[in-house]
Amino acid sequence: MELSSQSVLSYTDKYLTVDGKPWFPVMGEIHYSRLQPEDWERELWKMKNGGVDVVSAYTIWIHHEEIEGEWDFSGCRDLRRFLSEVKKCGLYCFIRIGPWAHGECRNGGFPDWLVKKQETATEAGEAVPCSDQANKRKMVLRSNDPEYLSYVRRFYEKIYEQAKGYFLKEDGPIIGIQIENEYGHCGGFTGPEGEEHMRTLQKMAREIGFDVPLWTATGWGGAVTGGMLPVMGGYCEAPWDPRTTEIEPSGNYIFTKERNDHAIGSDHGLGEDITFDMSKFPYLTAELGGGLQVTAHRRPIATGKDTEAMSLVKLGSGCNLLGYYMYHGGTNPEGKRTTLQESKETGYPNDLPVLSYDFNAPLKEYGQITDTWRRIRRLSMFLHDFGSELCEMEYIPQPGNPSDPGDLTSLRTAVRCLPDGSKGYLFVNNYVRRQVMKNHPGIELKAYGPDGRVLADFGKVDIEDGDYFFFPFETEVCEKDHEENRGMCQQRKSGMEDGKDHKNSRRLAAPITPLCLLNEGKSQETVYVAYGHDRSGKEQQGLKQTNVHDRMGTECFDLKQMLAPEVADRLNREGMRLLLLTEEESLHACKADMGGREYLLISNGDVIREEDGALSVRMEGKKDEELFLYSYPELLSTPEGFEKEKKEQHPGTLLDTTDMTLYTRKLDFIPSLRAELTLHDTLESEELHALLHVEGIMPEMEEAMVVLEYEGLSAEMRQIPPASGETLRKDRRAADSFYTGQPWEIGVKRFAGADGCADFFVVVHPLRKEEAVYLQKWPDMSKGYACKIRGLRVAEIRRIQLRFA
């Protein structure tokens, strides 16, 4: 969706609109002040290629005015430059201007000097009514206290100076603003006083000049919204939960019309109910956990499946905006007087790493592309081509769908369909993070309407622990009746909404998940791309290997043979083809527009479309690496340095990856990156100390990664300056980590000297058996503690440009 200053953005009670038409965007959070400015454009392109339409970003007050009156919009704090990069990448933007943000920042983003203006200390974020004269406070934070509002106005004015010229009405990227965060839920006032404060902040922002079509506010946990669009959230776990034990299954894996996540912010005190009328607002999310930020006491590891399954459940439950927090991890900037992370020392409930805000996000702290990125991209591809129609499909609860998140036996299902029931999707989830779900072999899958009528019958499907998917169905008008077909595409006679039996109608329902459309509405043939999940053909059809499958190292069934002939008949009549992928292939697939024609590309690297449509591939540079690229349709010319595999063209309607054209290229990488670790004796301490030397860091590398596998409570690296007379500052960190059991990945390119080298002092702190911390898997504690480095490796992240003659 391309917007301009003439575009009219609004919303109905069901969805967002652009010029009156439904719009289903994908939004992802990135904090410009937690990234290097020279990396912004590169990382924004990755976000766009991951399916993000709108970036959201906190403007964190303490990052801009740590010292009262000393404003800093330079370097990583240069909001104006960031907005120009957002525009350059063709993205849109929501700025979350607070003034309180949270974001695991010191004081929730409030500068220390502002907090100290309260004469009497209060619990972090807690508001006290101005009428409480007994306290005789000079100022009450997060209230309509005139003094507080005067500081907020000054902050808003500074942010506006940076944003001016970048609003949508000026052909800029800013389409929306969020006021405050979790107000009335994590601090602030509730009830009429809270609503009035939210309206006051919005009014102030408008007076200053902020002019956007969309204004939002936190909607969960009793937060007040001031009449603005409520946005919801949901996380697969709760690292803020004070417990250090395994916690109950998340409610975010249950299909439900309820929008409230009762777990968010439980460390600050929980408001039980939402405060707005759900019937008046669309179901939008701004804080679906793209990952999880670990805390000192609780360190769950979010996976790609954790996030994708949760996202699918939200789609099935009627959500019409997928907004992820965080989409891109980062590193806290260095403070001028203090460190800038959330900590118990400042009265907040959790201790966070001083620097790392990795979040196990789809794009990690140093821009590493993850499985989560690929899985979110897969959903986003579907939404870009089918989302506007999905917006108009209502959520319909299904019989047998459980309401208890702890029910690991019942199959979880939902339907979204058009009001007349003529078209829709059946959503199925048999995945709950870190839980074993009951298998459902040969289960009859049916989609039911609100009146109990069968909308679609998918026949018998094997559903196993960990499966989640959605299948399409629709009504087709036929020339004659059809008998029930028990093949993989089921057809049903159906009574329509008037209760009459229409003999010339049937239901088409296929157990494949749509991925995207190629060349819809263009002069070329339209290709419907989908991927398969069903296992019932395994024994009957046997395994089928293709070149793509061989390279992916996966097994595939002949999905084409698992679909009934009526599918081909239908596609032929509509002038379409169906391209079927396996699960693994779909994770490596992307669309690319070249010369006005859309192509589906599958590669063993990550294909990124950049400025002016240029294509590049990101992958780890290894010796004798082969890059392969599959395309449908065949590219007009072979990329430079690639060889094309000659193949026969198949005229059929049903296609799979054997019908794609293969291009291969031998890469002449000569890895230069090396690292050496030298352990130091620490006789007086159980800490592990080491010197790390890295060399061969080259400018052409996108990133130079050092990967440390360690066991301990935490670790940090301090850079040793080049020989220049400087002494090592013990308090100046280059990177840090809370141990989770995952390898610690550090991007060191930013630390390289002119000689391509960097040196660090590494400290690993011991993890003791009695430590009050939740870990998914503990290391060997036979000595009563763990403190060691088990492995060291390096990884060169390379960018390979695809050039065409």
For the regions a language model picked out, list residue spans one by one.
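N-terminal carbohydrate-binding accessory modules
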Residues: 1-54
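The substrate-binding groove and active-site-proximal loops of carbohydrate-active enzymes
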Residues: 25-36, 61-77, 134-154, 180-194, ...
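Aromatic-lined substrate-binding rim segments of carbohydrate-active enzymes
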Residues: 41-108, 206
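Aromatic- and acidic-residue-enriched segments that line the glycan-binding/catalytic groove
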Residues: 69-77, 99-136, 189-194, 198, ...
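Carbohydrate-binding surfaces of carbohydrate-active enzymes
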Residues: 117, 126, 137-138, 148-164, ...
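Substrate-binding cleft/loops of secretory-pathway carbohydrate-active enzymes
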Residues: 186-206, 210, 218-258, 403-406, ...
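Glycoside hydrolase catalytic-domain groove-lining segments
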Residues: 226-296, 352
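Aromatic-lined ligand-binding clefts that engage carbohydrates, nucleic acids, or primary amines
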Residues: 695-733, 737-738, 763
